[in-house]
């Protein structure tokens, strides 16, 4: 479970990599592959595997979802700059969430334009499938989650003109 602004959300999956700052995990929804998520460890409030989860875990393993831990894109997660350098050549859309702002939670889906020391420059595609004219400078300190490989972003990537 993750918590910010007194809101808790859960990610179900197999952990892949852990650093002092971040955790990379597979994401599984209803026994279906939903890509990968990288979240800040400071937002993680609970990690658990209940006895009742063992049956669900066996289903996921039988469906081959545990094999997703061998993904090739992100191997080191010590800093956001390091993570974005590894995702720079990812053949798909990346989603960035900035959830800690009380007045506005920002969601970006698109491609990395440039990687700076404290920000990532990001080209965003709207929900209408049209590229935003503006390139967004997203400060690392605002980023709460990075995800990729999920069906939502894969469908947009497939149908949005490059």
Stretches with model-predicted labels:
Residues 1-10, 22-24, 28-104, 126-162:
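Short glycine-rich, low-complexity segments
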Residues 9-17, 107-113:
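Short beta-strand-centered aromatic/proline hotspots
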Residues 109-125, 129-130, 134:
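Extended, basic/helix-rich recognition subdomains
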């Amino acid at each position: 479970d993750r918590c910010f602004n007194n809101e808790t959300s859960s990610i179900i999956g197999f952990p892949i990599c852990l650093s002092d700052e971040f955790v990379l995990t597979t994401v599984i929804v209803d026994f279906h592959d939903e890509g990968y998520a990288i979240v800040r460890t400071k937002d993680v409030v609970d990690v658990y595997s209940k006895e009742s989860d063992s049956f669900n875990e066996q289903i996921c393993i039988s469906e081959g979802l545990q094999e997703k831990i061998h993904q090739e894109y992100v191997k080191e997660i010590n800093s956001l700059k390091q993570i974005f350098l590894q995702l720079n050549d990812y053949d798909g859309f990346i989603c960035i969430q900035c959830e800690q702002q009380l007045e506005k939670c920002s969601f970006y889906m698109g491609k990395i334009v440039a990687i700076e020391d404290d920000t990532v420059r990001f080209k965003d595609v709207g929900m209408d499938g049209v590229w935003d004219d503006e390139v967004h400078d997203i400060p690392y300190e605002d980023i709460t989650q990075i995800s990729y490989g999920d069906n939502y972003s894969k469908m947009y990537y497939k149908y949005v003109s490059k």
